[in-house]
């Protein structure tokens, strides 16, 4: 159960994460607001909101910020209207990208994404050109510097996880989307997760050398620097020296 690296966004060094905390919070607040607007403000009956709030808690967002974002979402159609867009794209060396956006201006976002892709040697794909390479799964990630791999594996499989993947001091618990809440709720009684979300999982990962992988990482980071871009999912197998 090894040989995989992180499924979701590329991991940044702590200093860079701290420097971008406000940007991260802005994106999380936007996601919480949209989730509450679409499905209501009750976390128990709104799975998307539940996942968004959990992400915010993992990122140490203050409770007050979370509550304000929910109230803003259930306040109706006041203020800016956001649209959800997912762009399918290719990075250099055949790496596939799924670029998830929340935007109040589709034309601006499309132009920005195309520009960064072009400068980074990538290109925008047509609908369906990349999405077939990914499938939806529940993802719960634990830091193995805090917990024992065997304990996580035992409890996760007991409660119905599909798989546990270990790489780079992390254990990734994979579930079906339907079992995600059940597995997460049980594991929360034992461990504190680093990530918990319904994620797009690549069917296969592409292995590149260090220099090539760095080029992909830089492109992903430039895309994620845009406020409109919520997340970039890729199928790059990140070399251990870069993780």
From Swiss-Prot:
Which residues are connected by disulfide bridges in this protein? none
Entry keyword annotation includes DNA-binding: yes
Q: Does the keyword Signal apply?
A: no
GO-annotated cellular components: cytosol
Which keywords does UniProt give here? Answer: Cytoplasm, DNA-binding, Transcription, Transcription regulation
Q: Which Gene3D superfamilies match?
A: 1.10.10.200, 3.30.70.980
Per UniProt, subcellular location reads as: Cytoplasm
Q: Which Pfam families match?
A: TACO1_YebC_N, Transcrip_reg
Give GO terms for biological process: regulation of DNA-templated transcription
Please, which domain of life does this record's source organism belong to?
Answer: Bacteria
Q: Name one GO molecular function term.
A: DNA binding
Q: Which InterPro entries match?
A: Integrase-like_N, TACO1_YebC-like_2nd/3rd_dom, TACO1_YebC_N, Transcrip_reg_TACO1-like, Transcrip_reg_TACO1-like_dom3, YebC-like
| UniProt similarity note | Belongs to the TACO1 family.
Q: What name is this protein filed under?
A: Probable transcriptional regulatory protein BB_0025
């Amino acid at each position: 159960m090894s040989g995989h690296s992180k499924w979701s966004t590329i991991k940044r060094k702590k200093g860079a994460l701290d420097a971008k905390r406000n940007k991260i919070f802005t994106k999380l607040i936007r996601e919480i607001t949209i989730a509450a607007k679409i499905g209501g403000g009750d976390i128990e009956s709104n799975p998307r909101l539940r996942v968004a709030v959990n992400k915010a808690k993992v990122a140490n967002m203050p409770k007050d910020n979370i509550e304000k974002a929910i109230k803003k979402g259930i306040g109706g159609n006041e203020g800016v209207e956001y649209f959800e867009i997912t762009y399918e794209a290719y990075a250099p060396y055949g790496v596939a990208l799924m670029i998830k956006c929340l935007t109040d201006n589709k034309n601006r976002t499309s132009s920005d994404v195309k520009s960064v892709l072009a400068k980074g040697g990538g290109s925008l794909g047509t609908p369906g050109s990349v999405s077939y390479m990914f499938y939806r799964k529940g993802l719960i990630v634990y830091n193995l510097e805090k917990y024992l791999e065997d304990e996580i594996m035992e409890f996760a499989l007991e409660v119905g996880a599909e798989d546990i993947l270990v790489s780079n001091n992390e254990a990734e618990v994979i579930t079906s989307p339907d079992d995600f809440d059940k597995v997460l709720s049980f594991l929360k009684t034992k461990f504190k997760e680093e990530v918990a979300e319904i994620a797009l999982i690549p069917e296969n990962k592409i292995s590149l050398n260090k220099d090539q992988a760095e080029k992909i990482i830089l492109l992903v980071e430039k895309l994620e620097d845009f406020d409109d871009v919520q997340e970039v999912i890729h199928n790059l197998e990140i070399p251990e020296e870069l993780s």
